[in-house]
Curated annotation (Swiss-Prot):
Gene3D superfamilies: 3.30.70.1730, 6.10.250.290. Pfam families: Ribosomal_L10. Keywords: Ribonucleoprotein, Ribosomal protein, RNA-binding, rRNA-binding. SUPFAM superfamilies: Ribosomal protein L10-like (SSF160369). Belongs to the universal ribosomal protein uL10 family. This is Large ribosomal subunit protein uL10. Part of the ribosomal stalk of the 50S ribosomal subunit. The N-terminus interacts with L11 and the large rRNA to form the base of the stalk. The C-terminus forms an elongated spine to which L12 dimers bind in a sequential fashion forming a multimeric L10(L12)X complex. GO terms for molecular function: large ribosomal subunit rRNA binding; structural constituent of ribosome. GO terms for cellular component: large ribosomal subunit. The gene is rplJ. One of its GO terms (biological process) is translation.
Length: 172
């Protein structure tokens, strides 16, 4: 890799750390190509990415912004998982790590400054995704309106039933 390619990789990593809500750091030692491909396809379904990175390039891209604790994440054979939704990548990687002992969770970076340990990444994976939170929020917003509409329609329905009862009584 020549100097221009390294600089290009550093810029790409900077944009990853800036744009991704959370970056999950893993050790992938011993994983086969088929296992990596399966993990990547699972992540791709959720609009996330799994990328093997060079530690020195990551440390230059982060430029010391996360301190020594963050630099300690990037030792050995490291791959990062990231996506537009901070929770989805953590969820998929955590689930895959349970199924495959070769993939080890090391930690993560939330935002650009907060370093997460393995337990924090597992806790992040238990949170609902952004789409699930939006769905719950919309449900909470719509519920009162639906109840109000039901309450407002109830007297009209009762009146219609009373009139129908009188009509059937008079017809009989």
């Amino acid at each position: 890799m020549d100097r221009a390619q390294k600089q290009e990789s550093i810029e790409a990593l900077k944009s990853v750390f800036a744009d991704a809500g959370a970056v999950v750091v893993t050790h992938y030692m011993g994983m086969t190509v088929a296992e990596m491909t399966e993990l990547r396809s699972r992540l791709r379904k959720e609009d996330a990415t799994f990328q093997v990175v060079k530690n020195t390039l990551v440390q230059k891209a982060l430029d010391g912004s996360i301190g020594e604790a963050g630099d300690a994440l990037f030792t050995g054979p490291v791959a990062i998982a990231f996506g537009s939704d901070p929770v989805s990548a953590a969820k998929i990687v955590t689930q895959y790590a349970k199924e495959n002992d070769k993939l080890k969770l090391v930690g993560g970076i939330l935002g650009q400054t907060t370093v997460l340990d393995e337990a924090a990444v597992r806790a992040l994976a238990t949170l609902p995704s952004l789409d699930q939170i939006r769905g719950k929020l919309i449900g909470l917003i719509q519920a009162p309106a639906t109840k109000i509409a039901g309450v407002l329609q109830a007297p009209a329905g009762q009146l219609a039933r009373v009139l129908n009862a009188y009509a059937t009584k008079d017809a009989a």
